[in-house]
Amino acid sequence: MHSTVSDGWRDPDEVAHLAADRGVRVMALTDHDAFHGVERARSVAHRRGLGYIPALEVTTYPPNQMRHILGHGVDVAHPQLLSLIARTQGVFRRQVQAWLKVLDEQGIGRGLGLEAFAYKPTVMPGAVLKVLLQHGLMTETDAWDSARKAVDFMPADFYAPIPSPREAVDAIHAAGGLAVHAHPGSVPDQDLMKEVLPLVDGLEVYTRRHRAEQIPVYEELAGRHGLLMTVGTDYHGFNGADYEAPKTVIDIRYLEKLGARVQWPAVEQAG
């Protein structure tokens, strides 16, 4: 689940309320390369009686391959992990700055406060996209084309700071978490996706991003590599879309593997 901290359309507390309203019992806010929404989401989750897993989704190189690594049950203050995601946040910020410059030159979005993105602790192109779509200034396709063209002039090593999958997994493990390959069906080059499987602890098999015929493929891959199969929605609330809880229940073995990393409200109150 994603919030306005990265590229989601709803605030962290609203995302947690939606999860509770739809009967979810354990949730994780997995914003891209950021933890700024954790406290707000966890506070609401615990007030609503949900277990909470501190988590994030780490972007890895090359970014166009969508080899995103979920870190579940991580220490959100761990220096190695914070240093890693700061590198990616720097790339995102330069992307956004370049895009905002192009939009301003074209006279698009003036008066909408887009310049405020320069002061946000984290920023992604998807956050700018949200504003453009909400005000009907561009179609989604045109907006992404505009964003890509804005960074075409960047040097070849522009994306070099983004970590490799191995770096991401190592940092997640160092922070005490479990590493899960998110939505493997979204990776254009499936051979590159398979290279990551020996590194991770789990595979996100059950997600709305997978077609029905893809599920057995990733079940077989998970079994072959001894990976726990996880459940996710990859919810972004795009264009105000409602939240639909997963139809597959999380494997109890994965919750057992997470153990004390799942923060239950009773534990918080006792502390």
Summary of predicted features, one role per range:
Residues 1-65, 146-157, 167-173, 178-181, ...:
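An N-terminally biased module of ancient metal coordination in phosphate/nucleic-acid-related enzymes
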Residues 43-191, 254, 259, 265, ...:
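Extended substrate/RNA-proximal surfaces in nucleic-acid metabolism proteins
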Residues 243:
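Nucleotide-sugar donor-binding patch of glycosyltransferase catalytic domains
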